[in-house]
Regions:
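C-terminal lobe/tail of nucleotide-utilizing enzymes
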Residues: 23, 47-89, 213-230
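C-terminal helical cap/extension that packs against the catalytic core
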Residues: 22-41, 56, 124-127, 133, ...
Length: 231
């Protein structure tokens, strides 16, 4: 269903690029391109090489592009950057003049707030907007890759119309402890206490905060007590 919705933006007689998808979603995109007479190119994960992961900067090579650097953290951002390069190659094929230096500087300068974004240090504070199982799996993968031996403190809020039980199943076991919050002034927000009760069977080290400010203060104090705490 999501693939069908996203394929709806495809315009006839255009060039389409996409990250690698699950077979069912890939078939939807292929059919949409066939119906609208579009060329289609998927990212080839096998051609992503020389990957160097890092919080401040990451690098990789893809096809003819060597040692490309990005400032975005998160293992999935390498895939996103490779997709951007596929877009560049498609534009060049259409006659757009994009120099290698423009592409390199553009990738390095790109920011994406709310996607595994470091917003504080000592302790490291990471903000991520994962709100569905797929995004939660990606967050889990990134936390395990970048902080395999670090203690994690979570401040956690969800909307009640999302599959928060699956998000909890994927991410809650990673946390040393979890403070749940309710998004203020939003009718879709899941109450902090209700969210804490949902978390408890997966990770009993959970408590509900009255406000986001209270949660941030508590968790920062806890994280500063040790030198290896991330939240």
């Amino acid at each position: 269903k999501i693939a069908e919705q996203k394929a709806g933006i495809i315009k006839p007689h255009t060039s389409v690029v996409s990250a690698k998808q699950e077979p069912e979603a890939e078939a939807v995109i292929k059919n949409a391109c066939l119906e609208r007479d579009c060329s289609l190119q998927f990212v080839d994960p096998a051609q992503i090489t020389d990957v160097q992961y890092g919080i401040a900067r990451q690098s990789f090579s893809y096809k003819g592009w060597k040692q490309m650097e990005i400032s975005l953290a998160g293992s999935y951002q390498i895939i996103n950057a490779a997709l951007a390069l596929e877009g560049v190659m498609a534009l060049r094929a259409l006659g757009w003049r994009l120099t290698d230096e423009q592409v390199r500087s553009g990738l390095l300068a790109t920011k994406w707030r709310g996607r595994f974004t470091v917003i504080g240090e000592h302790p490291t504070v990471i903000m991520d907007g994962a709100h569905n199982p797929a995004a939660a799996q990606t967050l889990k993968d990134s936390l395990e890759r970048y902080f395999p031996d670090r203690k994690l403190h979570f401040i956690f809020g969800m909307f009640k119309d999302k599959d928060y039980h699956e998000v909890i199943r994927l991410t809650a076991p990673l946390a040393e402890d979890i403070v749940t919050v309710e998004t203020p002034d939003n009718p879709r927000a899941l109450p902090a206490q209700e969210l804490a009760e949902a978390v408890y069977p997966v990770n009993p080290h959970v408590r509900a905060a009255k406000t986001v400010e209270e949660a941030v203060g508590e968790v920062l104090d806890e994280a500063k007590e040790g030198c290896e705490h991330i939240y």
